[in-house]
Curated annotation (Swiss-Prot):
Higher taxonomy: Bacteria, Pseudomonadati, Pseudomonadota, Gammaproteobacteria, Enterobacterales
Chief location of this protein within or outside the cell: secreted
Cysteines paired by S-S bonds: none
Listed name of the protein: Protein ParB
Species name: Escherichia coli
Active site (UniProt): 53, 61, 95
All residue ranges annotated as the TNase-like domain in the record: 27-157
Any single GO CC term annotated in Swiss-Prot or TrEMBL for this entry: extracellular region
Length: 177
């Protein structure tokens, strides 16, 4: 009897660890109510706005070349539309990091789910996100290289500056001023 109680206690403890260790989120659904910039949106979920940062991409900043065009491209895909967000994590600013999916209405075919993060990179409106110089997602890097090769979007500018370099230079100018 003691052995069975001990085994059940261990099983319950293991289950509790799994429940606690598993993220409380997996996905969220809602309507996009605001476009912050080319890689950040507000999604209305249960009447509450949730700030979502598109994971694995880095779009130009608002005041950077192509920043407004990236914001407009994202708005064209998702503004006032219902989306599904596959949540990956939360960043240091409290934003949900995730992959955003939207159904695209195509003539003569049923709606097709579209990975908005990938579409932004493929259209040349964002870079594949880098961590310590390496792309976080190899597929995003492939899409970036394809867009670069076709010179679409920001790749039409031969002097396009990566957002992480632009932010660093912008911070340096602010510190000097």
């Amino acid at each position: 009897m003691k052995r069975r109680s001990y085994a059940m206690l261990r099983a319950a403890a293991a289950l509790a660890v799994l429940v606690v260790a598993s993220p409380a989120w997996a996905e969220l659904r809602g309507e996009v109510v605001r476009i912050i910039d080319g890689d950040t949106i507000d999604v209305l979920v249960d009447k509450q706005p949730v700030r979502v940062r598109l994971v694995d991409i880095d779009a130009p900043e608002k005041r950077q070349a192509f920043g407004e065009r990236a914001r407009q491209a994202l708005a064209g895909m998702v503004f006032r539309r219902h989306v599904l967000v596959d949540e990956k994590d939360t960043d240091r600013y409290g934003r949900t990091l995730g992959t955003v999916w939207v159904n695209m209405e195509l003539a003569s075919r049923p709606p097709q789910p579209r990975n908005v993060n990938a579409a932004m990179v493929h259209q040349g409106m964002a870079w594949a996100y880098r961590f310590h110089g390496r792309a976080a997602d190899p597929e995003m890097l492939r899409l970036e290289q394809e867009a670069r090769g076709k010179r679409v979007g920001l790749w039409s500018d031969p002097h396009a500056v990566e957002p992480w370099k632009w932010r660093r230079e912008s911070n340096n100018r602010r510190d000097e001023g």
